[in-house]
Design a protein with these regions (language model features):
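Residues forming the flavin
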Residues: 1-291
Length: 291
């Protein structure tokens, strides 16, 4: 999305192919799924306009020290994000506002000459003489291009498989796997702030925990802690369970949650490029079977 925005601002007319739905249709599909409806494999918490980030809580934390981060923050504010993200130490947009921001960025790209195609999955890469020449969409239409930006995320497993089948250079890398844990927000507030934890001057509290077993080379740590948020069903494949955490702007649900993760490496799941995906699917299926 930001690649397209930068290109459009510099006089190009990018074409964006999104395998999922626009953010409004996507929101409806997700709400139906959360209420017990059928999962739509291309319109869910992972896939659709804005990617998985649209249904996160919009924490804008990074360890990267780069001047371009300011440009990203400015673009968010121009699209409707809270102005305080420019100066807060832990800037936060909120899922409810992110949906508006994503839509406004889309309209900005279109106003600058870009085009966006929803429900348009890249099903093949057209390669000639080791150079990208275009993409195939939905096994039908072909578009020529001298440059292709692939915003693949971590859930487009079929696209990883496609890249592998095309002989694209890839390698397995470590990642983390775990669960989501919930607590009453008051419990976390009191632990962090003490007896004055109910003061209206204080924001809802968060936390970060890490344990490192140096002998075994294994770490357990909290990740993406969502104060005043909720745990959400985030699967993108039938018969599997995935969860995520998110918070709206006001963070007022009364429930805190965090991922609790352990690192895994190719020594755990195998050194073939796609072994990590098989490892993930195995545990997602086990969670589904367990209910």
């Amino acid at each position: 999305m930001f690649s397209a925005l930068v290109l459009a601002k510099n006089g190009y007319r990018p074409l964006i192919f999104e395998r999922g739905s626009d953010v409004d249709t996507r929101h409806q599909d997700i709400e139906k799924f959360w209420q017990g409806g059928q999962l739509k494999e291309n319109s869910n918490v992972q896939f659709g306009e804005g990617g998985a980030g649209t249904f996160s809580d919009g924490k804008l934390t990074t360890r990267i020290n780069d001047s371009k981060i300011t440009d990203v923050i400015e673009a968010f504010v121009e699209a409707g994000a809270p102005p305080e993200i420019k100066y807060l130490h832990k800037p936060h947009i909120g899922t409810d506002i992110l949906r508006i921001v994503v839509k406004n960025i889309r309209e900005k790209i279109k106003a600058l000459g870009g085009e966006i195609f929803f429900n348009s999955q890249v099903t093949d890469f057209i390669i000639k003489d080791d150079k990208i020449c275009g993409v195939e969409i939905n096994h039908k239409e072909k578009f020529t291009a001298s440059d292709v930006f692939l915003g693949i995320g971590h859930s487009a497993r079929d696209t990883y498989e496609l890249l592998y089948s095309k002989g694209i250079s890839m390698e397995a890398k470590p990642f983390a796997i775990g669960v989501r844990i919930e607590h009453p927000q008051d419990l976390i507030d009191k632990a962090q702030y003490g007896e004055d934890y109910k003061s209206e001057l204080l924001p809802v509290a968060d936390y970060s925990l890490t344990y490192n077993n140096r002998q075994k080379g294994r770490s357990v740590y909290s990740f993406c802690m969502c104060p005043g948020g909720q745990v959400v069903a985030a699967a993108s494949e039938l018969g599997r369970v995935v969860v995520n955490g998110m918070s709206n702007y006001k963070r007022n649900s009364g429930i805190a949650n965090s991922a609790l993760l352990v690192n895994v490496t190719p020594d755990d799941f195998g050194h073939n490029v796609l072994d990590g995906i098989a490892f993930q699917r195995h545990y997602e299926e086990m969670a589904y079977i367990c209910g």
